[in-house]
Amino acid sequence: MASRVSAPPRGREPQRYYDRRGRDDAETRKRGSRSPQPLSEDEELTDADPPRRPNAGPRRRLFLEETEDRLTSLLESLTKDIESDIEHFERKLRVLLQQKDTI
């Protein structure tokens, strides 16, 4: 007896994928990947764009705020480290230039 190929259940829509701006992303859907594509060079994400999860609960908002605080702290720390390194190399460069002038 021949085996039958099962069809997808009726009434169910295929999975839809959306890009960062909430638009249906046909290219992503074609590949079957759930991850959004990076914005192209002529696109940029702005505050006017709709949020990805407009109904985020209080736990999600708290998580996002804490993450933003940690990232801000890390950025400030890295900025200080870079500024310190720049000052260090400027001092070394001045010393080397002075030594060059004395030779």
Swiss-Prot record:
Residues 1-64 are annotated as: Disordered. It comes from the Viruses. Disulfide bonds: none annotated. Phosphorylated by host ERK. The phosphorylation triggers a structural change that enhances keratin binding and protein stability. Residues 10-30 have a biased composition (Basic and acidic residues). It is found in: Host cytoplasm; Host nucleus. GO terms for cellular component: host cell cytoplasm; host cell nucleus. Assembles into oligomeric complexes. Interacts with host CDK1. Interacts with host SRPK1; this interaction may favor expression of late viral transcripts. Interacts with host cytokeratin components KRT8 and KRT18. Contributes to multiple aspects of the viral life cycle including viral genome amplification, suppression of suprabasal cell differentiation and egress of newly formed virions. Induces host cell cycle arrest at the G2 phase by associating with and preventing the nuclear entry of host CDK1/cyclin B1 complexes. Inhibits cellular DNA replication by preventing loading of host replication licensing proteins MCM2 and MCM7 onto chromatin. Within the cytoplasm, associates with host kinase SRPK1, a splicing factor regulator, and inhibits its activity. Belongs to the papillomaviridae E4 protein family. This is Protein E4. The gene is E4.
